[in-house]
Amino acid sequence: KNVDKKDYDSRFNNTCNQRVNIDLISEDIKSSYEKLYNNLNTFEGKMSLDKIKDTDYYKEFVTKMLYRYRASVYDKNAEDPYCWMSYLLKNYKSEEVYDFCKKAFAKMKKEKIRVEEFLSPDIKSKAGRVSIKYFVGIRVLDEMVDLYRSFGENGIDCYIVSASFIDIVRAFATDKDNNYRMDKKKVLGLRLMKDDAGRILPKFDRNFPITIREGKVQTINEFIKNDRNYGPIMVGGDSDGDFEMLTFFDETEIALIINSENTGSIESLRKKAIEGYSRFYLQERNVNEGRFVSLEKS
């Protein structure tokens, strides 16, 4: 839902150099998932997860889900164009999202940081064989933890305003094992509707702004600012989705750009930071070690 139907960029051609699109890849994902569902012992089958992992349909499902996430772009003409990734969580409850996210975070923190290539098996499929490279590993940034704590100790409230689905961000930011230990109420993000049973629906909750670009400014103005406080004295971000938040508020003394080398409008702010503008600062990082560094290039 809400994914552009046109062929993917040629960078994502299959191994036979043929174009692929969301309809083709979705058929393969559906087919492999049905096999997983019918064979995995936690669903309708008798096979353990360890044995399932050796099957072609497991490898097909994992590779093409990762490929779908990386290759797909949102449909700019859709009603809620940005939300398509979160729609994958349809029918989950918040507690279930929290649970599997925390398990995933715990596992990824133990993984060696690396770039891994996934290749789908040589089986009959609609999209053909595809490969995709993925960054594996997640780390708690000690420098960021120290910053949050220092602010808190000096009476400065810290908030997270993320473009990601709110339940996923809260699962990470509030987890005691991740050291951030944020107050759940101070972690804001994309919100979806839920049914009467609390299950997530693939529909944006219009009681809240979409937390990207201008929507992040709206979120701060509507849900953080009040008669007893004012705009943020410091804002951090790394992409175009943060541009308005980094530039909008007159009260902001420090706009910290985390250098992830994303392209777009954020490049102009990186340039200002390098040129020495008093408001903008560039923070480099060592992605291989999961930490911030005092260098001119990440």
Where do the protein language model's features map onto the residues?
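A metal-dependent, Asp-based hydrolase signature
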Residues: N2-Y134
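C-terminal cap/substrate-recognition subdomain and adjoining C-terminal extension
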Residues: D75-K76, Y92-S298
